Amino acid sequence: MTDNNKYRDVEIRAPRGNKLTAKSWLTEAPLRMLMNNLDPQVAENPKELVVYGGIGRAARNWACYDKIVETLTRLEDDETLLVQSGKPVGVFKTHSNAPRVLIANSNLVPHWANWEHFNELDAKGLAMYGQMTAGSWIYIGSQGIVQGTYETFVEAGRQHYGGSLKGKWVLTAGLGGMGGAQPLAATLAGACSLNIECQQSRIDFRLETRYVDEQATDLDDALARIAKYTAEGKAISIALHGNAAEILPELVKRGVRPDMVTDQTSAHDPLNGYLPAGWTWEQYRDRAQTEPAAVVKAAKQSMAVHVQAMLDFQKQGIPTFDYGNNIRQMAKEEGVANAFDFPGFVPAYIRPLFCRGVGPFRWAALSGEAEDIYKTDAKVKELIPDDAHLHRWLDMARERISFQGLPARICWVGLGLRAKLGLAFNEMVRSGELSAPVVIGRDHLDSGSVSSPNRETEAMRDGSDAVSDWPLLNALLNTAGGATWVSLHHGGGVGMGFSQHSGMVIVCDGTDEAAERIARVLTNDPGTGVMRHADAGYDIAIDCAKEQGLDLPMITG
């Protein structure tokens, strides 16, 4: 048992430069990335260890955080630290090519895999919600989801508006760690956006980091700005302080017609992440402690109203989609029988990318030097010279995205290219072109690392939406391949009982041994995504597997 204190008035920042505080870069890297997750420029509520996504934490409590830091500092390169729901529980002798850290967060036996049981365990200090990259120490701020959101909006523009979103506007809500990416992604895709958020502090943070351009004073002002900017063909993002469950029905009532509707509130967690209509945030937080069941009920009732408004927009022929927060499920449980009439974003727009192992490849400069990221940007362009779409993304990212914490970059690439880039980055460290090692990781939202029937694996061709062997195999293979740290989580994105997913991070320290590990891991990891989709019968994935020489006994053998 440990002290369950989750609050500490402290500011944490990862060390910079090339001086070690641990015994090697293989242990320095997870140490810095853990600290980076709690950097006040990165985390949503770092003093309570909350990184993003409602209550997604980096460590179970402050005593556990202290002990993780202490253990990583002394860990040898033939030892592995085991972390159980944010608590360091053991160090065991392994070998130099094994992961230095293995993490399991929020996992529950299926019958008990619900918020009620999890919240009981959390209150007792026995569990921690790791979200996806919070408890796996590879969150890089809102940039981590910007490109995926951008790709979604661009593809929606191709499907519905002839390839251009100029003069169009997106209606959405939520400006937290994930939702905060939406306004910038819409702007980069060429659209205006109206972004509803119930916490002023989150709007302030997105304005400060240039993820949102302006704040409207009220709904009338917001609509006037939208009308002006769309008429001028400008892509400007507007924040509006308010509650989506109140504002969306009002927009329907007024006959307002957005060009696209989605949502990224923290609806996955009704107790901690979704403000009921008519409530203040202070009331919500206080009553969550004293009347949790009533709070959950009120939040889900508001979600039902919110989703009904989204359905009303869809009935008007407006492209409407779920952005992976499980709000449709919550509404269905509150009596909205047709909540799933509008699709999730993955089957609607992203799955063809997943079939080729393309997903949110990301890296961070442990040096803390922005120039190291700019050099890697140039290397990506050099090694992938003919992808104009990717080059445009990198140019826009450099111009518009503010680094949060350690400088980092997100770049959606797939099987073949990930290993190529990783080996090139490792060589840049070896030659001294980069001033310190880099880490390469990804979101758990990737092609082969998640089972989530209401999000990434919704409407799989063969009906295998809920089969969760795939992320388990992904984690096992990345462990065998020698990733520097590997994580296996439950409940990220869509909440308890609705997802299982795995993550990996690998260090490029410039050594020959690192190159061997990089070649294995960055081939195998996206390879499992191609495998998973080929197994489900997707022709794009089957063709990719054959082109890339994957050995899939039932398909290519």
UniProtKB/Swiss-Prot annotation:
Binding site for NAD(+): 53-54, 131, 177-179, 197, 202, 243-244, 264-268, 274-275, 323, 493
UniProt xrefs under InterPro entries: Urocanase (IPR055351), Urocanase-like (IPR023637), Urocanase_C (IPR035401), Urocanase_central_sf (IPR038364), Urocanase_CS (IPR023636), Urocanase_N (IPR035400), Urocanase_Rossmann-like (IPR035085), Urocanase_sf (IPR036190)
PROSITE patterns: UROCANASE (PS01233)
GO molecular function, one term: urocanate hydratase activity
The protein's required cofactors: NAD(+)
Recorded catalytic activity of this chain's protein: 4-imidazolone-5-propanoate = trans-urocanate + H2O
Any one Pfam family match given in the protein's UniProt record, by short name: Urocanase_N
Keyword annotations from UniProtKB, A to Z: Cytoplasm, Histidine metabolism, Lyase, NAD
Cellular compartment(s): Cytoplasm
EC number: 4.2.1.49
Note describing how the cofactor binds: Binds 1 NAD(+) per subunit.
Pathway: Amino-acid degradation; L-histidine degradation into L-glutamate; N-formimidoyl-L-glutamate from L-histidine: step 2/3
Segment forming the signal sequence: none
Gene3D superfamilies according to UniProt: Urocanase like domains, Urocanase superfamily
Biological process (GO), any one: L-histidine catabolic process to glutamate and formate
Catalytic residues (UniProt): C411
Gene Ontology annotations for the cellular component aspect, listed alphabetically: cytoplasm
Family listed: Belongs to the urocanase family.
PANTHER family: UROCANATE HYDRATASE
Role noted for this protein: Catalyzes the conversion of urocanate to 4-imidazolone-5-propionate.
Protein name, entry field: Urocanate hydratase
Origin species: Pseudomonas putida (strain ATCC 47054 / DSM 6125 / CFBP 8728 / NCIMB 11950 / KT2440)
Organism placement in taxonomy: Bacteria, Pseudomonadati, Pseudomonadota, Gammaproteobacteria, Pseudomonadales
